[in-house]
Amino acid sequence: MRLTWPGHACVLLEGSQRVLIDPYVLNGTIPKDPDLVVLTHGHFDHFGETLTLDAPTVAVNDLAKALSALGMQATGLNFGGSITINGVTVSLTPAVHSVSMLELDGTKIMCGEAAGVVIRMDGVTVYHAGDTALFSDMRLIGELYHPDVALLPIGGRFTMDSAAAMMAAAYIGAPMVIPIHYNTWPAIEQDADAFKEAIERTTDMQVMVLPSGGSIEI
């Protein structure tokens, strides 16, 4: 599987399918023609280009219902639920974050709670924490899903910061960690290289700090 970080919280997974998570970047290009879009929640910096992409979408149930009402092919999940679409299994996990609201087609809608997602494709399991604070049940996410890669926000202010994300990485126990949701704006500036050094100095985990648009094979 190839993992690409276009920027912010947006991640593209390419294997037997093209799965795009949270299609928003501030300055850059959103990958086109995904087979599946997965949303962690409805805040603008995660919902992004969902309507323009017009691809099958998986989201928390409230948001999926709103998208379905607009004629999109959207599938809803709730915490603990999973669905498999064309060989890609998406599971919804809790996150600790605020409820989101969007204005779609001139109507303001409540988009439900924020979530994390676990995506399994081609024998690889990726956990995208979404926007979240640190919470102790991240240990259960590690025990239940055994992710190969954990995508963790480190920006602070609106999510956990790099120090809390270090604890999250230890709770989850994925062998590879990739920081996301940082340095998009001054309010969420963090030193990702220092985050990498601190984790790799004290654990056996590998931290991959990707440039915007950067990719790795996992």
Curated annotation (Swiss-Prot):
GO molecular function: hydrolase activity
A Pfam family annotated for this UniProt entry: Lactamase_B_3
Alphabetical UniProt keywords: Hydrolase
Domain of life: Archaea
Listed InterPro entries: Metallo-B-lactamas, RibonucZ/Hydroxyglut_hydro, UPF0173, UPF0173_UPF0282_UlaG_hydrolase
PANTHER family: UPF0173 METAL-DEPENDENT HYDROLASE MJ1163, UPF0173 METAL-DEPENDENT HYDROLASE MJ1163-RELATED
Family, similarity comment: Belongs to the UPF0173 family.
Protein name from the UniProt record: UPF0173 metal-dependent hydrolase Mpal_1063
Species the sequence originates in: Methanosphaerula palustris (strain ATCC BAA-1556 / DSM 19958 / E1-9c)
